[in-house]
């Protein structure tokens, strides 16, 4: 049974871990590569406390992001229906398409919130009418926004 050393990584290392991770490695790997290159530091009680503080700050930051996304979801629910104006032809067929950027602009105009257009999922929109879009605010939070497409 070989002895393993605990080290804290100072930068990302492929197949080993990310910056700030506490990992166990072979003594030779630590002594000959990780420590001399400055890639890792030996895990002392003081460094372990720093790692735990960093992890706690990261947990707090992620929790704050989630709470912010939940608050934005509630704000989007209270906005009501958005209105998107498009040029139409015969039988209420719209020219072009309603894009995610159109929906993001309507949300910004109505709710005052910046929303990343890449997080918006739209149905196929070919005619005027009422539609729903899914807006991903956070990996765990998705809001539904209703909007009407009307003629110019």
Curated annotation (Swiss-Prot):
Biological process (GO), any one: translation
Protein name per UniProt: Large ribosomal subunit protein bL9
PANTHER family on file: 50S RIBOSOMAL PROTEIN L9
GO MF term list: rRNA binding; structural constituent of ribosome
Cellular component terms (Gene Ontology): ribonucleoprotein complex; ribosome
Entry superkingdom: Bacteria
Organism lineage string: Bacteria, Bacillati, Cyanobacteriota, Cyanophyceae, Oscillatoriophycideae
Keywords recorded for this protein, A-Z: Ribonucleoprotein, Ribosomal protein, RNA-binding, rRNA-binding
SUPFAM superfamilies: L9 N-domain-like, Ribosomal protein L9 C-domain
Known function: Binds to the 23S rRNA.
Keyword Transferase included in the entry's annotation: no
Family membership: Belongs to the bacterial ribosomal protein bL9 family.
């Amino acid at each position: 049974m070989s002895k393993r050393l605990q080290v804290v990584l100072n930068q990302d290392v492929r197949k080993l871990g990310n910056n700030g991770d506490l990992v166990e490695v072979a003594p030779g790997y630590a002594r000959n590569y990780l420590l001399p290159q400055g890639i890792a530091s030996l895990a002392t009680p003081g460094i372990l406390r720093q790692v735990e503080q960093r992890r706690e700050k990261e947990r707090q930051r992620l929790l704050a992001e989630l709470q912010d996304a939940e608050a934005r979801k509630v704000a989007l629910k209270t906005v009501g229906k958005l209105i998107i104006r498009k040029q139409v032809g015969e039988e209420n067929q719209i020219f072009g398409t309603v894009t995610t950027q159109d929906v993001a602009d309507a949300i910004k105009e109505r709710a005052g919130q910046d929303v990343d257009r890449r997080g918006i999922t739209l149905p196929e929109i070919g005619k005027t009418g009422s539609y729903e879009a899914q807006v991903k605010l956070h990996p765990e939070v998705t809001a539904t926004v209703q909007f009407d497409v009307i003629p110019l």
